[in-house]
Amino acid sequence: MEGGGKFNSMEIEVKLFATLRDYLPKGSGRFSCKMEVDRSTRVQDILSRLKIPEEIPKIILINGVHGKKEQILKEGDVLSVFPPVAGG
């Protein structure tokens, strides 16, 4: 984090499921990682930071509730990202 300091940063948890797990940083848990981010961080910023391609469809939950890429995250949020469910 650049020039932020403790007052401008916060910790969130990111959980990636199925094929998206490949985008977790090295050394992460099996499905999740903790991230220190700026207080103005949006979901899209996290997806970009993890290098998840924009064109991959995603289902986004924040604390278990449907979220949007433009949504600003808060201290302690749990961001869960799933690929769409398909099958028949």
Question: Language-model segments: which ranges?
Answer:
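Ubiquitin-like/PB1-type beta-grasp interaction modules and other compact soluble beta-rich domains
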Residues: 1-87
